[in-house]
Amino acid sequence: MVTKEQLKEKLKLYVILDRKLGNGVPLRQQAQLAIAGGATAIQLRDKEMKGRDYYQAALVIKDVCKENNVLFIVNDRLDVALAAEADGVHLGQEDLPLHAAKKLAPPGFIIGISAVNVEQAKLAEKGGADYLGVGDVFGTASKPDAKLTGVDMLKMICQSTSLPCVAIGGINVNNAKIVLDAGAIGIAVISAVVSQKDITGAAKALRELIP
């Protein structure tokens, strides 16, 4: 079971794997290369993968993360996260409600919640979430239709909660410092790492920006 301070350390560079944005690099290799560059957390995210395939992929990524003492989070699917013995799950506002997930989750299981405003952040904290994913901050290729949260709202959310806030959405080496200065304890990225030719180098460049 990780403490809140340990969790903050584990959430500093949160890399989300993506089959489509990974330029043909297998998910396992994406994880290995990102971790080699300093990723502290890995999330498996796939909106199209069937349950069985998602579970099999989760087992593979869990082993990579366990070998490297890196946090492993499954996106959306609590059933897959629990079956694969992941460290936790990340739930969006339209996914399984937090209170329902808490009933099923074992002690020490990490639950992250997406938040785009202060109200959502406060509800997540009250409901027992462990961290917040805040964004879409700058706009991103993985969610082209997402409404932008912006840096000002990110700052308001970070100030409104004691939960660790991880900024997400269009974050790269050029703007990472902006979200960290706004109060985020870490950054979550997809294309800024897994879409790059040098995944390890891209992760390393970002990790060096995070205190």
From Swiss-Prot:
Q: Which cofactor does it need?
A: Mg(2+)
User: What's the EC number here?
Assistant: 2.5.1.3
- Residues binding Mg(2+) are D76, D95
Its BP terms in the Gene Ontology are: thiamine biosynthetic process; thiamine diphosphate biosynthetic process
Q: Keyword Nucleotide-binding: yes or no? A: no
Extract the NCBIfam families matched here.
thiE (TIGR00693)
Role, per record: Condenses 4-methyl-5-(beta-hydroxyethyl)thiazole monophosphate (THZ-P) and 2-methyl-4-amino-5-hydroxymethyl pyrimidine pyrophosphate (HMP-PP) to form thiamine monophosphate (TMP).
Q: What is this protein called?
A: Thiamine-phosphate synthase
Q: Which organism is it from?
A: Coprothermobacter proteolyticus (strain ATCC 35245 / DSM 5265 / OCM 4 / BT)
Q: Which gene encodes it?
A: thiE
